[in-house]
């Protein structure tokens, strides 16, 4: 079973604008650290899904210069951005990670993939009951589950988040 990854990222943030391109050390950005961590994971394709806003053009340029695949979509309807990205790349099973979490643990990623592959679930996460620190959350779901959520989400709160 192939598990692909969509990483949601944006430059706009009320608490810390531009945090995904924050220079953490020697020119290495937050998003770069995240991709370094994911290199040793069992994830197949990794796509960064960013808004179409002009403020995100700098992130788009950085990703292109770093040879990182990128998808641009709705700024406010993050569920639609994810759904359209999954369709564009024909993903069947998707891990969701946020781009401002450079300390994601590839062992946790691989353990989640293994658990998802060996279960008969449509959704798996390590964050329903908090046992992991903030910034290490992962979610895996089927493209079918994502499509159902996309079709039936009506409230603004259901569209601005990919999962509850």
What are the language-model segments listed below?
Residues 93-97:
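Short aromatic-hydrophobic micro-motifs that form the base-stacking/packing surface
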Residues 141-164:
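Active-site oxyanion/phosphate-handling segment shared across diverse enzymes
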Residues 15, 103, 140:
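Short aromatic/basic micro-patch
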Residues 75-76, 101-103:
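Acidic metal-phosphate-binding loop of nucleotide-sugar-dependent transferases
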Residues 105-131:
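Conserved donor-nucleotide/metal-binding helix-loop-beta segment in metal-dependent transferases, i.e.
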Residues 16-39:
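Short, well-formed alpha-helical segments that are part of the catalytic scaffolds
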Residues 1-17:
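N-terminal nucleotide-binding beta1-loop-alpha1 segment
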Residues 31-92:
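Conserved N-terminal catalytic core of the sugar/cofactor nucleotidyltransferase
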């Amino acid at each position: 079973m192939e598990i692909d990854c969509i990483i949601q990222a944006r430059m706009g943030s009320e608490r810390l604008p531009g945090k995904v391109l924050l220079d953490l050390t020697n020119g290495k950005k937050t998003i770069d650290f995240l991709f370094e961590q994911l290199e040793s994971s069992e994830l197949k394709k990794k796509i960064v899904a960013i808004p179409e806003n002009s403020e995100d053009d700098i992130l788009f340029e950085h990703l292109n210069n770093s040879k990182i695949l990128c998808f641009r979509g709705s700024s406010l309807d993050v569920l639609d951005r994810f759904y359209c990205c999954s369709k564009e790349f024909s993903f069947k099973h998707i891990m969701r990670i946020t781009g401002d979490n450079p300390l994601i643990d590839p062992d946790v990623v691989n353990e989640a993939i293994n658990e998802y592959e060996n279960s008969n679930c449509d959704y798996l996460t390590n964050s329903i009951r908090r046992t992991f620190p903030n910034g290490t959350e992962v979610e895996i779901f089927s493209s079918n589950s994502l499509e159902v959520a996309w079709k039936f989400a009506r409230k603004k709160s259901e569209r601005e988040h990919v999962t509850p």
